[in-house]
Amino acid sequence: MDANQKLLDFAKLLNQKNDSRPVIEKLKDNISGDLLNYFLNLLEEISKLDTDQPLSVTSLRCLQLFVHLTFLLGVYTQLPKEMLSQAKIKALPIYTPKKNLVQIYNILLPLLLTPSLLQGPLNLHYADLLLLHLYLLNCHEQGSLIEEPRPLFLDPSWKEKVTSIMSPQMVDPSKMISSCLSLLQPNVDNWLQDKLKHYLTTCLCRETGVQGFLKVYMQAQPNSIERARQAAHLISSVPKDISPQKYFSCILPQVWSLFSTQPRLASQLIIAVTNTHCDIVTSFLLKKLQILEAPKVIDLSPFENALDVLQVLVYIQNDDIIRICESCVPSLLHLQENTTLRSKVQDILLRIISVCGTKSLLRNLTNAKHLRIFCERLTKSQLAMFLPNLLEIWVQQPPDKRLELLELVQYALSNVDSDEIPSNVMLSVCTNLINEVASQNKYSSTEISQITTNREVEEENEEILLVLLNIISSVIGRNAELDLENPISSLLPALEQLSNYSNREISDLAKDVYKTLIQSKDDYSLALSYTQSDLVPVRGQGVYMLRKLIEKKDDRINPVRVLHVLINLLRDENSYVHLNVISAVVSLCDKYDDSLIRLLKEYTNTNKFTVDETLLIGQAIYQTMERQGELVAKFYGQIEQTCLSMLNNENTDIKISSLNIARLLCQMTSSDAFIESAKNILILEMGSDKQFLRRAAVQLLDSCKHLPDSVITTLSYVGSHDKDDFIKESCLNILANQADAAKYYLQ
């Protein structure tokens, strides 16, 4: 009977439904002689079968079982128990093998080397064969292998073959790493622990070792951040038998390659290594990023590779990594000249200034043209934040560089709205610069109007003064709420002196700015009085002035009083005033936390306000939540209770308003109460006048990540039977999204 037929016969035997005995008991009754010897002989027979010969699934499973039983009876029973896992120890049968471990090793090892039908089943037990190999190797080193036969690894003719399947330098890294990790049991002897760790280190230092380790380690939880951190910690731990420099010289190039395929894992690795060996990481990254300093781009590939890595690095929240990114700014500014790379370069620069501010762009400025290219990419808001530092650098430049930067300063000024400029920062910068220019040698210590003999320097300084004074004039023109606190108090003396300056344009401008600042002293009272004016534009200006005072958290602001004033202004009949009031209320809630709580209480006070006024308060709450984003979660309980209360209101528009607020909250955090309320609306509110209420309920459900089965059932019904096409289509989209989310979760 050939080996294939034996497999089929044993498969039938083992699948007998009326025989519930253990597998080994069944086999003992049908095999004459020693079980282990029979299995080993059968495996040798199978190894001689034609590899193209098809095996049924049943035969293959039977073969896998025989290989497993061979290890169970021949290997597990003879190895020390501390080397085995608890599962293997529990599975041990009462059996004494007639072949020792060396004999079994010498049979199984050639089978693994020979291309045959056994390759797959044996590789499933590769870790066990590796364990047997290491055990026998240790026995040999301890001098306890003195009897025949000798293990094959001692046979010179087999040495190279054994190395090819047992050496960590030859075997596929992921296969070896997986085996070593599975063998690292808590109670294994120190010699085995050291040997396995050495094998792991050897694998990690190979060209694809890190990738192999991550493939194995992350397999259980591929999307887990915590698992990724654990993997990074293990890889960044330097083994005892190798220096950090040598170890990371093998690891870091692999991490660099990972940035293109697994950026999230590469980031965790870089963070872990930086925390323990910052100098090594810094040196490595700077050397790799040095390509960006090349004067010309000949081959795009290395530049794109470096930029791809840098694009990931700029999002790592680590000060040392950020400093490395910052050091690349001059090179990045220069690389903007390459049209292919420009977009990616500018994205990186934008991220750097969002983290480090704009000074990093100016600290090593060598070419104003490069900076101008970047500034053209900035939004007005970004340009406004950039302007103060640009002015500082401009004034501090040597005379031959100022003219080059002046064009950029003028470009920035002409493209920034005056109310976009950060007022206090800008005024502080301009004040310091005016005092600096005014104190230069062209003036005496007492007379700022004294003319220097060096006319060229004076003209240049006059140009600077004009720019700075115009900026200040523009800022205070849109910020009537500025008081005489710093930096204004330190600006007034310089303005007084400049009022007597010989250049008429400068003196007139200085007088005008000085007068405006003095008159702005009592702007808070002025703003409140404006809100009571009969003229719509004046009321609007009063609200605008209050909003600006709120946004800078002026000490004179009483949040309770101001909220009361603003809510009363919602009764104003003019929509222009409404819009300004809502913006001011949003700013108040953003700056003073308790204001949102008070606003929620006012929202529920429907006896005090008309429906339209209640809806405007709801709009203010909605916009406040939009501005605060995830920070609004701290008011989750109050917002949820308020919305649930308002859903009981008889007015449909008020219900829709509360559903819109609830929808925004559900985008940030889940609420079973909101989901249930929306479901009930779809079931109960069926009239034609409830169409928009039902739409709002569907939109709320669309904002929820996970919906219970009862809601899915409701959506399925509504999606098929509702008369409103918008509602039907929305329901079907929600169902599709929920199905996709469930599919992703299962994967």
Curated annotation (Swiss-Prot):
Family according to the record: Belongs to the Tango6 family.
Segments crossing the lipid bilayer: none
Pfam families documented for this protein: RTP1_C1
Lineage, uppermost ranks: Eukaryota, Fungi, Dikarya, Ascomycota, Taphrinomycotina
Keywords assigned: Cytoplasm, Nucleus, Repeat
Subunit structure: Interacts with RNA polymerase II subunits. Interacts with nuclear pore complex subunits.
Location of the protein in the cell: Cytoplasm; Nucleus
Disulfide bond entries: none
Identification of the protein by name: RNA polymerase II assembly factor rtp1
